[in-house]
């Protein structure tokens, strides 16, 4: 595993981006970019290429094999996909080319629709599942096929129009995002083939510079000591070739856990603080991670962000992190506590019953060691990073009376006809199931029946606040890390989650869905429109 994440750097796009889709130059027929005059002309330019890469090695015991990845114009062959660094107040246009082979072998589909999870962007740049494209094919919500599509990421905080301050509400900042394919019915196989990468957003508080002289800056550990880690379980056939079950609608449990595309990798660190950004990349498994010594003694760390959003205060001396699919957790580990030569492991102790993707079963020690960490050197310079006592303040919640006056929408997640439904219906991309006024504040109730399944539910476009959790009508305490802003909410049996949602700054079509990727591909999704 590389000791430094590979970053995506800016480029010059030719032909230059335009407000309307440049179909004459080969762009897919998307709708016009919203707020183009405000953000388009000054946007920084980047490009990514979805392409097949030959010779990827998951582990030396496995044969080289083709995978699908997002690549920079000049590919870094040490990683599956580059990490994007971006900043609030600096809009960017990312041109995403589809260079996948049209006549590929194996699972997946060579069309793409790239979703930046959970960016606050116009719907035309959100990676709507029907916006998939290739040079010869267009999804139902596009007007023409194309070899590329421009995504305008305005990099404004939610509340831009409300506050009229030119940037939005800094308390609504996102931090750890990830981009992935979101093609209708093929999200799971395309992600399993490799179409996923990290996207990190910074601002004046979380500036990505531990030496930042700005007194407001948090000075958290920064690149190259800010390390994103994706965890995905995968199946391999007897010959060591990546395999995907294209039949089961329930979910998939892999026999190996891959970390940033590698099986049992080693991360070598210096004796100093690191920020580790953990992502459950799916498709179906839940994880509960512990940092342990070789004798399985648990080591403490500091929990600073949930679903990519900084908490208002760090949670000190934590011992584990539990993640459903698409959930993220940022933790800070101080490796200065350990002498050079120390070996540590990140272990998953959360089990599922064999071949049962319904829900996690139980926590069992010692668990599976999925990542080896070796403290192998002194830091080259003094560690100036810190974890301050206060991180990012949370926007205040409405009063009890204000909450009582808000509109409430109810969404039941259940199995139906061997598929997956929301309020008894399967996905229909042509018809919105909810029309939400732009600027609205609403309560969305997410719940399930007694069917034995957990559903990590993702709502596109804005973060939500978990107001309450009840099981069988009894209040359940909200964990400290879940009291911040979230975009994935795990529903279990007979449980009702009340989530406060806002819908600001952009209009258009978005989706809510179960992020168990198999459930998502088997119709557990609905379209909602901001109008």
Predicted regions and their residues:
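N-terminal, post-signal-peptide metal-ligating segments of extracellular/periplasmic oxidoreductases
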Residues: 1-135, 148, 246-276, 310-313, ...
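A conserved hydrophobic secondary-structure block that centers on an alpha-helix together
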Residues: 90-92, 143-190
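Short, surface-exposed ligand- or partner-binding patches at beta-edge/loop junctions that are enriched
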Residues: 168, 172, 177-180, 336-352, ...
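Active-site pocket scaffolds in enzymes
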Residues: 61-65, 110-145, 149, 298-319, ...
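Divalent metal-coordination and catalytic microenvironments
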Residues: 48, 94, 114, 181, ...
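Histidine- and aromatic-rich segments of cupredoxin/plastocyanin-like copper-binding domains
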Residues: 121-143, 231, 235-389
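Short, hydrophobic/aromatic beta-strand segments
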Residues: 59, 102-113, 193, 285-292, ...
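Short acidic/polar inter-strand loop motif in beta-rich domains
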Residues: 185-191, 350-357, 518-524
């Amino acid at each position: 595993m590389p000791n430094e994440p590979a970053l995506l750097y800016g480029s010059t796009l030719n032909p230059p981006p335009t407000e309307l889709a440049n179909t004459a130059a080969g762009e897919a027929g998307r709708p016009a970019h919203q707020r183009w005059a405000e953000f388009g002309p000054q946007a920084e330019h980047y490009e990514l290429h979805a392409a097949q890469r030959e010779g990827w090695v998951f582990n030396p015991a496995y044969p080289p094999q083709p995978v699908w990845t997002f690549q920079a114009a000049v590919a870094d062959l040490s990683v599956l996909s580059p990490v994007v660094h971006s900043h609030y107040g600096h809009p960017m246009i990312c041109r995403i080319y589809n260079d996948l082979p049209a006549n590929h072998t194996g699972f997946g589909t060579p069309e793409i629709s790239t979703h930046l999870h959970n960016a606050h962007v116009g719907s035309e740049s959100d990676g709507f599942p029907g916006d998939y494209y290739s040079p010869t094919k267009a999804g139902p919500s596009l007007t023409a096929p194309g070899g590329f599509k421009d995504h305008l990421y305005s990099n404004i905080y939610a509340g831009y129009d409300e506050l009229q301050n030119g940037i939005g509400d800094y308390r609504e900042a996102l931090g750890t995002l990830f981009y992935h394919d979101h093609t209708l019915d093929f999200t799971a196989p395309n992600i399993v083939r490799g179409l996923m990468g990290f996207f990190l957003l910074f601002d004046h508080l979380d500036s990505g510079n531990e030496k930042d002289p700005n007194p407001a800056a948090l000075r958290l550990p920064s690149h190259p000591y800010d390390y994103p880690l994706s965890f995905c379980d995968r199946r391999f056939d007897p010959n060591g070739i990546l395999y995907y079950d294209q039949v089961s609608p329930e979910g998939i449990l892999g026999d190996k856990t891959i970390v940033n595309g590698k099986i049992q990798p080693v991360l070598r660190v210096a004796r100093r603080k690191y920020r580790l950004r953990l992502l459950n990349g799916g498709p179906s498994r839940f994880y509960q991670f512990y940092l342990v010594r070789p004798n399985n003694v648990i080591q403490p760390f500091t929990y600073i962000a949930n679903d990519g959003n900084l908490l208002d205060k760090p949670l000190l001396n934590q011992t584990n992190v539990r993640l459903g699919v698409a959930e993220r957790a940022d933790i800070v580990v101080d490796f200065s506590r350990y002498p050079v030569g120390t070996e540590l492991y990140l272990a998953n102790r959360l089990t599922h019953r064999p071949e049962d993707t319904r829900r996690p079963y139980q926590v069992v020690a010692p668990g599976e060691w999925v990542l080896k960490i070796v403290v192998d050197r002194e830091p080259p310079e003094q560690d100036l990073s810190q974890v301050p006592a206060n991180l990012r303040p949370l926007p205040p919640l409405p009063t009890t009376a204000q909450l009582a006056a808000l509109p409430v929408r109810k969404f039941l997640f259940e199995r139906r006809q061997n598929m997956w439904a929301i309020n008894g219906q399967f996905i229909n991309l042509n018809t919105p199931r909810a029309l939400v006024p732009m600027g609205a504040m609403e309560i969305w109730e997410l719940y399930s029946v007694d069917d034995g399944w957990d559903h990590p539910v993702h709502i596109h476009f804005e973060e939500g606040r978990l107001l309450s959790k009840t099981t069988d009508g009894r209040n359940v305490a909200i964990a400290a890390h879940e009291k911040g802003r979230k975009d994935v909410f795990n529903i279990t049996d007979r449980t009702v989650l009340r989530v406060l949602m806002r819908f600001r700054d952009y209009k258009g079509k978005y989706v809510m869905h179960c992020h168990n990727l198999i459930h998502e591909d088997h119709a557990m999704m609905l379209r909602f429109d901001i109008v």
